[in-house]
Amino acid sequence: MIHHLFVLDFVMIIILQKRKRQNCMKAKILFRVLLTIICIARVYSLISWMDSNSYIFRRFSGSFLVLMLAIPFLFSSCNSRNTKEEMQRITVKSSSDRIVSEWLDSIKVDVWAIHTDVPVAPIQSMDVIGNKCFVLDVFKRIFLIDIEKRLVLKSDITLGNARNEMLSPICLTADEEHVYVYDGMKECIFVLSYDLKLCQIVNTGCFFSTFRKIDNGFACLSMGSEQNFLFLRDDGVPVYSKQLSDKYPDEMQDGNPIQIGMDGYPYVKAYYSDTVFKWNGQELVESVQFDYGMGEPGGDYQKGSQLAHSGIAYTESYFLTNTHVLSSFVETDGRTIHYNLYDKENGVSCSGKMAPIDNVYFRATLQHGKEAYAVVLADEACVYGLKDIDMNNIVIIRYTFPS
Protein backbone atom coordinates (compact mmCIF):
# COMPACT_ATOMS: atom_id res chain seq x y z
CA MET A 1 0.00 0.00 0.00
CA ILE A 2 2.77 2.45 0.95
CA HIS A 3 4.64 2.12 -2.34
CA HIS A 4 1.40 3.00 -4.14
CA LEU A 5 1.35 6.24 -2.20
CA PHE A 6 4.82 7.17 -3.44
CA VAL A 7 3.55 6.65 -7.01
CA LEU A 8 0.80 9.14 -6.22
CA ASP A 9 3.44 11.51 -4.82
CA PHE A 10 5.32 11.30 -8.13
CA VAL A 11 2.16 12.06 -10.12
CA MET A 12 1.47 15.02 -7.86
CA ILE A 13 4.95 16.43 -8.50
CA ILE A 14 4.27 16.36 -12.25
CA ILE A 15 0.97 18.18 -11.75
CA LEU A 16 2.67 20.75 -9.54
CA GLN A 17 5.28 21.45 -12.20
CA LYS A 18 2.54 21.95 -14.79
CA ARG A 19 0.74 24.29 -12.45
CA LYS A 20 3.95 26.22 -11.85
CA ARG A 21 4.71 26.66 -15.55
CA GLN A 22 1.23 27.39 -16.84
CA ASN A 23 -0.82 28.55 -13.85
CA CYS A 24 -3.29 25.95 -15.14
CA MET A 25 -6.66 25.94 -13.36
CA LYS A 26 -7.34 22.28 -14.21
CA ALA A 27 -3.97 21.32 -12.75
CA LYS A 28 -4.79 23.23 -9.56
CA ILE A 29 -8.10 21.40 -9.13
CA LEU A 30 -6.54 18.02 -9.91
CA PHE A 31 -3.76 18.77 -7.42
CA ARG A 32 -6.23 19.47 -4.63
CA VAL A 33 -8.23 16.33 -5.37
CA LEU A 34 -5.08 14.21 -5.50
CA LEU A 35 -3.77 15.72 -2.26
CA THR A 36 -7.02 14.78 -0.51
CA ILE A 37 -6.86 11.22 -1.88
CA ILE A 38 -3.25 10.82 -0.74
CA CYS A 39 -4.03 12.00 2.79
CA ILE A 40 -7.02 9.65 3.08
CA ALA A 41 -4.95 6.76 1.70
CA ARG A 42 -2.14 7.48 4.13
CA VAL A 43 -4.51 7.40 7.10
CA TYR A 44 -5.95 4.09 5.84
CA SER A 45 -2.45 2.63 5.38
CA LEU A 46 -1.48 3.72 8.89
CA ILE A 47 -4.50 1.94 10.35
CA SER A 48 -3.66 -1.24 8.42
CA TRP A 49 0.01 -1.03 9.37
CA MET A 50 -0.91 -0.41 13.01
CA ASP A 51 -2.89 -3.65 13.15
CA SER A 52 0.05 -5.72 11.88
CA ASN A 53 2.81 -3.88 13.78
CA SER A 54 1.17 -2.95 17.03
CA TYR A 55 4.40 -2.97 19.13
CA ILE A 56 6.41 -0.83 16.70
CA PHE A 57 3.47 1.50 16.22
CA ARG A 58 3.12 2.11 19.95
CA ARG A 59 6.80 3.09 20.09
CA PHE A 60 7.07 5.24 16.94
CA SER A 61 3.45 6.17 16.18
CA GLY A 62 3.99 9.92 16.44
CA SER A 63 6.99 9.99 14.11
CA PHE A 64 5.36 7.77 11.48
CA LEU A 65 2.13 9.76 11.55
CA VAL A 66 3.94 13.06 11.02
CA LEU A 67 6.14 11.62 8.24
CA MET A 68 3.35 9.92 6.30
CA LEU A 69 1.04 12.93 6.35
CA ALA A 70 3.73 15.60 5.89
CA ILE A 71 5.20 14.38 2.58
CA PRO A 72 2.43 15.65 0.27
CA PHE A 73 2.25 18.99 2.09
CA LEU A 74 6.03 19.38 1.84
CA PHE A 75 5.75 18.92 -1.94
CA SER A 76 2.96 21.46 -1.99
CA SER A 77 4.82 24.11 0.00
CA CYS A 78 8.07 23.68 -1.92
CA ASN A 79 6.33 24.20 -5.26
CA SER A 80 3.83 26.90 -4.32
CA ARG A 81 4.02 30.17 -6.25
CA ASN A 82 4.70 33.45 -4.60
CA THR A 83 1.88 35.61 -5.90
CA LYS A 84 3.51 38.83 -4.69
CA GLU A 85 5.67 40.21 -7.47
CA GLU A 86 7.82 43.30 -7.28
CA MET A 87 6.49 46.18 -9.33
CA GLN A 88 8.84 47.54 -11.99
CA ARG A 89 9.18 51.31 -11.86
CA ILE A 90 10.41 52.60 -15.22
CA THR A 91 11.88 56.08 -15.42
CA VAL A 92 11.12 57.72 -18.77
CA LYS A 93 13.22 60.70 -19.85
CA SER A 94 12.00 62.84 -22.71
CA SER A 95 14.20 62.73 -25.80
CA SER A 96 13.88 63.46 -29.50
CA ASP A 97 16.71 61.10 -30.41
CA ARG A 98 16.08 57.89 -32.29
CA ILE A 99 16.06 54.72 -30.21
CA VAL A 100 18.90 52.38 -31.17
CA SER A 101 18.27 48.76 -30.22
CA GLU A 102 19.08 45.36 -31.68
CA TRP A 103 15.93 44.07 -30.02
CA LEU A 104 13.75 46.52 -31.94
CA ASP A 105 15.56 45.65 -35.16
CA SER A 106 14.69 41.98 -34.54
CA ILE A 107 10.93 42.60 -34.59
CA LYS A 108 9.41 40.83 -37.60
CA VAL A 109 6.70 42.59 -39.60
CA ASP A 110 4.07 40.95 -41.83
CA VAL A 111 1.59 42.99 -43.87
CA TRP A 112 -1.57 41.78 -45.61
CA ALA A 113 -3.67 44.05 -47.84
CA ILE A 114 -7.03 42.31 -48.30
CA HIS A 115 -9.75 43.39 -50.73
CA THR A 116 -13.24 43.86 -49.33
CA ASP A 117 -16.44 44.28 -51.34
CA VAL A 118 -18.15 45.87 -48.35
CA PRO A 119 -16.39 49.10 -47.33
CA VAL A 120 -15.29 49.01 -43.69
CA ALA A 121 -15.97 52.15 -41.67
CA PRO A 122 -13.56 53.40 -38.98
CA ILE A 123 -12.75 50.53 -36.66
CA GLN A 124 -14.27 50.59 -33.19
CA SER A 125 -12.94 47.26 -31.86
CA MET A 126 -10.84 44.37 -33.15
CA ASP A 127 -9.21 41.10 -32.19
CA VAL A 128 -6.94 38.59 -33.91
CA ILE A 129 -6.73 34.86 -33.18
CA GLY A 130 -4.28 32.95 -35.37
CA ASN A 131 -5.22 33.65 -38.98
CA LYS A 132 -8.64 35.07 -38.11
CA CYS A 133 -9.22 38.78 -37.61
CA PHE A 134 -12.49 40.12 -36.22
CA VAL A 135 -13.51 43.75 -36.68
CA LEU A 136 -16.38 45.87 -35.37
CA ASP A 137 -16.74 49.20 -37.19
CA VAL A 138 -18.55 52.37 -36.12
CA PHE A 139 -21.56 51.38 -38.23
CA LYS A 140 -21.96 48.39 -35.85
CA ARG A 141 -21.06 45.86 -38.52
CA ILE A 142 -19.02 42.78 -37.65
CA PHE A 143 -16.47 41.35 -40.09
CA LEU A 144 -14.45 38.16 -40.11
CA ILE A 145 -11.22 38.40 -42.09
CA ASP A 146 -9.51 35.15 -43.01
CA ILE A 147 -5.93 36.31 -43.38
CA GLU A 148 -4.63 33.21 -45.19
CA LYS A 149 -7.54 32.98 -47.64
CA ARG A 150 -7.77 36.78 -47.90
CA LEU A 151 -11.53 36.46 -47.45
CA VAL A 152 -13.84 38.97 -45.76
CA LEU A 153 -17.13 37.73 -44.30
CA LYS A 154 -19.73 40.10 -42.86
CA SER A 155 -22.09 39.06 -40.09
CA ASP A 156 -25.77 38.78 -41.05
CA ILE A 157 -26.95 39.56 -37.51
CA THR A 158 -29.24 42.58 -37.71
CA LEU A 159 -29.58 45.39 -35.22
CA GLY A 160 -32.82 45.57 -33.29
CA ASN A 161 -34.53 45.13 -29.96
CA ALA A 162 -35.58 41.51 -30.42
CA ARG A 163 -33.97 39.00 -28.09
CA ASN A 164 -31.58 37.58 -30.70
CA GLU A 165 -30.69 40.98 -32.14
CA MET A 166 -27.94 43.35 -31.07
CA LEU A 167 -29.00 46.84 -30.16
CA SER A 168 -25.67 48.59 -29.64
CA PRO A 169 -22.50 46.45 -29.98
CA ILE A 170 -19.53 48.45 -28.70
CA CYS A 171 -16.61 46.00 -28.46
CA LEU A 172 -15.60 42.44 -29.27
CA THR A 173 -13.03 39.81 -28.36
CA ALA A 174 -12.36 36.23 -29.43
CA ASP A 175 -10.77 32.93 -28.48
CA GLU A 176 -10.00 29.73 -30.40
CA GLU A 177 -13.70 28.81 -30.69
CA HIS A 178 -15.95 31.85 -30.49
CA VAL A 179 -16.32 35.58 -31.04
CA TYR A 180 -17.75 37.57 -28.12
CA VAL A 181 -19.59 40.82 -28.88
CA TYR A 182 -20.68 43.06 -26.01
CA ASP A 183 -23.93 45.01 -26.37
CA GLY A 184 -23.76 48.08 -24.15
CA MET A 185 -27.48 48.86 -24.27
CA LYS A 186 -28.58 45.33 -23.42
CA GLU A 187 -25.59 44.73 -21.12
CA CYS A 188 -25.05 41.25 -22.49
CA ILE A 189 -22.45 39.33 -24.49
CA PHE A 190 -23.44 37.75 -27.81
CA VAL A 191 -21.42 34.57 -28.35
CA LEU A 192 -20.89 33.89 -32.06
CA SER A 193 -19.32 31.00 -33.93
CA TYR A 194 -16.44 31.58 -36.32
CA ASP A 195 -18.93 31.86 -39.20
CA LEU A 196 -20.59 34.66 -37.19
CA LYS A 197 -23.73 32.69 -36.27
CA LEU A 198 -25.33 33.29 -32.87
CA CYS A 199 -24.61 30.52 -30.33
CA GLN A 200 -25.51 32.02 -26.96
CA ILE A 201 -26.38 35.23 -25.13
CA VAL A 202 -24.71 35.87 -21.76
CA ASN A 203 -26.29 38.47 -19.48
CA THR A 204 -23.81 40.56 -17.47
CA GLY A 205 -25.88 43.27 -15.80
CA CYS A 206 -22.95 45.68 -15.97
CA PHE A 207 -21.47 48.16 -18.44
CA PHE A 208 -17.90 48.21 -19.75
CA SER A 209 -16.16 49.81 -22.70
CA THR A 210 -13.70 47.09 -23.69
CA PHE A 211 -12.89 43.50 -22.72
CA ARG A 212 -10.72 40.49 -23.52
CA LYS A 213 -11.52 36.79 -23.30
CA ILE A 214 -9.19 35.09 -20.83
CA ASP A 215 -9.13 31.79 -18.93
CA ASN A 216 -12.41 31.13 -17.11
CA GLY A 217 -13.97 34.47 -17.97
CA PHE A 218 -13.52 38.02 -19.24
CA ALA A 219 -11.20 40.88 -18.27
CA CYS A 220 -13.15 44.14 -18.61
CA LEU A 221 -12.55 47.87 -18.24
CA SER A 222 -15.62 49.65 -16.93
CA MET A 223 -15.97 53.42 -17.18
CA GLY A 224 -18.39 55.80 -15.51
CA SER A 225 -17.28 58.62 -13.24
CA GLU A 226 -14.17 56.45 -12.70
CA GLN A 227 -12.37 53.52 -14.35
CA ASN A 228 -12.66 50.04 -12.86
CA PHE A 229 -11.36 46.59 -13.72
CA LEU A 230 -13.95 43.81 -13.70
CA PHE A 231 -13.47 40.07 -13.94
CA LEU A 232 -16.56 38.25 -15.18
CA ARG A 233 -16.97 34.51 -15.13
CA ASP A 234 -17.93 32.75 -18.36
CA ASP A 235 -21.57 32.94 -17.25
CA GLY A 236 -21.34 36.75 -17.02
CA VAL A 237 -21.30 37.00 -13.23
CA PRO A 238 -18.84 39.67 -11.93
CA VAL A 239 -16.70 38.19 -9.15
CA TYR A 240 -13.90 40.78 -8.80
CA SER A 241 -13.55 44.54 -9.23
CA LYS A 242 -10.86 47.14 -8.56
CA GLN A 243 -10.75 50.87 -9.14
CA LEU A 244 -7.89 51.85 -11.46
CA SER A 245 -8.45 55.58 -11.81
CA ASP A 246 -10.82 58.28 -10.59
CA LYS A 247 -10.53 60.08 -13.93
CA TYR A 248 -13.13 59.70 -16.66
CA PRO A 249 -11.54 59.65 -20.15
CA ASP A 250 -13.76 61.74 -22.40
CA GLU A 251 -11.22 61.14 -25.18
CA MET A 252 -10.10 57.58 -25.87
CA GLN A 253 -6.50 56.68 -26.62
CA ASP A 254 -5.27 54.56 -29.50
CA GLY A 255 -3.67 51.91 -27.31
CA ASN A 256 -5.73 48.98 -26.04
CA PRO A 257 -6.00 49.17 -22.22
CA ILE A 258 -6.06 45.35 -21.87
CA GLN A 259 -3.17 43.33 -23.30
CA ILE A 260 -2.13 39.69 -23.14
CA GLY A 261 1.59 39.66 -22.28
CA MET A 262 4.14 37.20 -23.58
CA ASP A 263 3.87 35.34 -20.26
CA GLY A 264 0.20 34.63 -21.04
CA TYR A 265 -1.19 36.83 -18.28
CA PRO A 266 -3.71 39.65 -18.91
CA TYR A 267 -2.56 43.19 -18.12
CA VAL A 268 -4.70 46.30 -17.81
CA LYS A 269 -4.06 50.04 -17.70
CA ALA A 270 -6.66 52.74 -17.26
CA TYR A 271 -6.84 55.43 -19.94
CA TYR A 272 -4.41 58.29 -19.21
CA SER A 273 -2.83 56.27 -16.41
CA ASP A 274 0.85 55.37 -16.02
CA THR A 275 0.34 52.19 -13.98
CA VAL A 276 -0.07 48.73 -15.52
CA PHE A 277 -1.74 46.01 -13.45
CA LYS A 278 -1.47 42.23 -13.85
CA TRP A 279 -4.36 39.82 -13.39
CA ASN A 280 -2.88 36.72 -11.74
CA GLY A 281 -6.11 34.72 -11.80
CA GLN A 282 -7.18 35.81 -8.33
CA GLU A 283 -6.52 39.53 -7.99
CA LEU A 284 -5.12 42.56 -9.77
CA VAL A 285 -1.59 43.54 -8.71
CA GLU A 286 0.64 46.44 -9.75
CA SER A 287 3.16 45.29 -12.33
CA VAL A 288 4.70 48.29 -14.13
CA GLN A 289 4.69 52.01 -13.43
CA PHE A 290 6.06 54.62 -15.82
CA ASP A 291 7.63 57.63 -14.12
CA TYR A 292 7.96 60.82 -16.18
CA GLY A 293 9.39 62.79 -13.27
CA MET A 294 6.24 64.85 -12.81
CA GLY A 295 4.28 62.82 -10.28
CA GLU A 296 0.70 61.72 -10.76
CA PRO A 297 -1.67 64.19 -12.50
CA GLY A 298 -3.57 66.26 -9.95
CA GLY A 299 -7.25 65.91 -9.12
CA ASP A 300 -8.11 68.91 -11.30
CA TYR A 301 -7.43 66.84 -14.41
CA GLN A 302 -10.66 64.87 -14.40
CA LYS A 303 -10.97 64.45 -18.16
CA GLY A 304 -8.69 63.23 -20.91
CA SER A 305 -9.00 66.47 -22.89
CA GLN A 306 -7.80 68.47 -19.87
CA LEU A 307 -4.89 66.13 -19.27
CA ALA A 308 -3.87 66.25 -22.94
CA HIS A 309 -3.35 70.02 -22.66
CA SER A 310 -1.95 70.13 -19.14
CA GLY A 311 1.75 69.91 -19.99
CA ILE A 312 2.00 66.46 -18.39
CA ALA A 313 3.35 63.45 -20.25
CA TYR A 314 1.30 60.26 -19.99
CA THR A 315 1.40 56.67 -21.23
CA GLU A 316 -0.61 55.73 -24.29
CA SER A 317 0.11 52.08 -25.16
CA TYR A 318 2.27 49.30 -23.72
CA PHE A 319 3.57 45.88 -24.77
CA LEU A 320 5.11 43.34 -22.39
CA THR A 321 7.59 40.66 -23.45
CA ASN A 322 9.82 38.34 -21.44
CA THR A 323 12.82 40.67 -21.68
CA HIS A 324 11.50 44.13 -22.54
CA VAL A 325 8.67 46.60 -21.98
CA LEU A 326 7.84 48.72 -25.02
CA SER A 327 5.53 51.69 -24.50
CA SER A 328 4.40 54.82 -26.28
CA PHE A 329 3.72 58.07 -24.47
CA VAL A 330 2.40 61.51 -25.29
CA GLU A 331 4.90 64.28 -24.72
CA THR A 332 4.21 67.38 -22.65
CA ASP A 333 3.01 69.27 -25.74
CA GLY A 334 -0.02 66.96 -25.87
CA ARG A 335 0.67 65.99 -29.51
CA THR A 336 4.04 64.30 -30.03
CA ILE A 337 4.12 60.54 -29.50
CA HIS A 338 7.44 58.97 -28.56
CA TYR A 339 8.43 55.48 -27.48
CA ASN A 340 10.26 54.07 -24.50
CA LEU A 341 12.08 50.72 -24.45
CA TYR A 342 12.93 49.17 -21.09
CA ASP A 343 15.39 46.29 -20.79
CA LYS A 344 14.32 44.14 -17.83
CA GLU A 345 17.70 42.41 -17.52
CA ASN A 346 19.88 45.48 -17.02
CA GLY A 347 17.16 47.89 -15.87
CA VAL A 348 17.99 50.47 -18.55
CA SER A 349 15.42 52.39 -20.58
CA CYS A 350 15.78 54.65 -23.60
CA SER A 351 13.18 56.89 -25.21
CA GLY A 352 12.64 58.90 -28.35
CA LYS A 353 11.62 58.35 -31.94
CA MET A 354 11.25 54.84 -33.31
CA ALA A 355 12.62 54.02 -36.75
CA PRO A 356 10.46 52.08 -39.24
CA ILE A 357 10.81 48.29 -39.14
CA ASP A 358 11.09 46.93 -42.69
CA ASN A 359 9.73 50.30 -43.85
CA VAL A 360 6.66 49.97 -41.60
CA TYR A 361 6.15 52.14 -38.53
CA PHE A 362 5.30 50.44 -35.25
CA ARG A 363 1.78 51.51 -34.27
CA ALA A 364 0.30 48.29 -32.91
CA THR A 365 -2.78 48.49 -30.72
CA LEU A 366 -3.38 44.89 -29.60
CA GLN A 367 -1.00 42.34 -28.06
CA HIS A 368 -1.52 38.58 -28.03
CA GLY A 369 1.54 37.04 -26.40
CA LYS A 370 4.47 37.19 -28.78
CA GLU A 371 2.54 39.10 -31.43
CA ALA A 372 1.03 42.58 -31.68
CA TYR A 373 -1.44 43.73 -34.32
CA ALA A 374 -2.84 46.74 -36.09
CA VAL A 375 -5.81 46.79 -38.47
CA VAL A 376 -5.60 49.73 -40.85
CA LEU A 377 -7.99 51.25 -43.38
CA ALA A 378 -6.66 52.56 -46.68
CA ASP A 379 -6.89 56.25 -45.70
CA GLU A 380 -4.72 55.55 -42.63
CA ALA A 381 -2.04 53.53 -44.43
CA CYS A 382 0.33 56.46 -44.92
CA VAL A 383 0.66 56.86 -41.13
CA TYR A 384 2.23 53.38 -41.06
CA GLY A 385 4.50 54.14 -44.02
CA LEU A 386 2.43 51.94 -46.36
CA LYS A 387 2.13 52.98 -49.98
CA ASP A 388 -0.11 52.14 -52.95
CA ILE A 389 -2.93 50.75 -50.82
CA ASP A 390 -6.20 50.43 -52.74
CA MET A 391 -9.18 52.20 -51.21
CA ASN A 392 -11.10 48.89 -51.15
CA ASN A 393 -8.39 47.20 -49.08
CA ILE A 394 -8.19 46.62 -45.37
CA VAL A 395 -4.63 46.14 -44.08
CA ILE A 396 -3.59 43.82 -41.26
CA ILE A 397 -0.12 44.30 -39.75
CA ARG A 398 1.46 41.75 -37.45
CA TYR A 399 4.54 42.58 -35.37
CA THR A 400 6.31 39.52 -33.91
CA PHE A 401 8.53 40.25 -30.91
CA PRO A 402 11.86 38.39 -30.61
CA SER A 403 11.56 37.64 -26.86
What are these regions (language model features)?
Residues V111-F139:
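Beta-strand-rich domains and repeat architectures in extracellular enzymes and scaffolds
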Residues V118-V120, I157-N164, N203-S209, L244-D250, ...:
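Short coil/turn segments at the loop-to-beta-strand junctions that recur within blades
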Residues S94-V120:
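A short helix->beta-strand "capping" segment at the edge of beta-propeller domains
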Residues K132-D137, E177-D183, N216-M223, G261-A270, ...:
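Short beta-strand elements that form the blades of beta-propeller/WD-repeat-like
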Residues P122-S125, M166-C171, C206-K213, D250-I258, ...:
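Repeated scaffold domains used in trafficking and secretory/extracellular systems
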Residues L151-E176:
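Blade-loop segments of beta-propeller domains
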Residues Q289-A308, E345-G369:
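Conserved blade-ending motifs and adjacent loop-strand segments that build the rim/top face
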Residues F75-S77:
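C-terminal motif of bacterial Sec signal peptides marking the signal peptidase cleavage site
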